[in-house]
Amino acid sequence: NKTNLKQLKAEAARKKAXMQDMXTSVKVEPLXAXXNGAXRM
């Protein structure tokens, strides 16, 4: 359970970083690209 929580937190942090740094991260971070696409819709 603790590992799952850590994974969720890491994923949330990654999404946050992707949103803050969209222009650079879109090509590198699939998560950021997905979040960017969802935001555009």
From Swiss-Prot:
Alphabetical UniProt keywords: Protease inhibitor, Serine protease inhibitor
Induction, as annotated: By infection.
Gene Ontology MF terms in the entry: serine-type endopeptidase inhibitor activity
Function comment: Inhibits trypsin and the toxin proteases PR1 and PR2 of M.anisopliae. Does not inhibit chymotrypsin, subtilisin Carlsberg, proteinase K and porcine pancreatic elastase.
The protein's name: Inducible serine protease inhibitor 3
